[in-house]
Amino acid sequence: MEELCYFCLKQLFLEFKVENNSNHIIIRCTSDKLDALVAPELKSLFLHHSNNGANAFVVDLENVKYCDSSGLSALLVGNRILKEKEGKLVIFGINPMVQKIIAISQLDTVFNIFENEQIALNNIK
């Protein structure tokens, strides 16, 4: 029986759908929560894909209804990784409750947040 690597095993249980495009990666959160249980997987995705050459991420949070400090931390990790590579992270589809948490945390000045996917995609080019 073949052994699966840790990352491959985690892929089986991810709360995210990943789309590889020619000049960017779209990460769609399929969970309604971006919390301490889900955030490590998002961090792993940022690290894995950036280590494999990706320098532009589009994060779809349309399904996310709840985000805690772990979720915000995961997004900050992705943002930091991409800034170090002179890349870009854009986020779209944030619901009002999550937007409020981001604003209270004063991260609305840190993240590149857009209303919809098309506007987000236009801003990574």
Task: Kindly label every feature range from the protein language model.
Residues 112-116:
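Short acidic-hydrophobic, aromatic-tinged amphipathic segments that line or gate anion-handling sites
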Residues 29-31:
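Flexible glycine-/small-residue-rich
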Residues 33-111:
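Amphipathic alpha-helical interaction surfaces in cytosolic regulatory modules
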Residues 25, 119-122:
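A short acidic, often aromatic-flanked loop/helix-cap motif at beta-alpha or helix-coil junctions
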Residues 96, 118-119:
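Acidic phosphotransfer microenvironment of two-component signaling modules
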Residues 2-27:
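Short beta-strand/loop segment at the start of cytosolic alpha/beta domains
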Residues 16, 121-125:
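Short hydrophobic/aromatic patches at helix-to-coil boundaries
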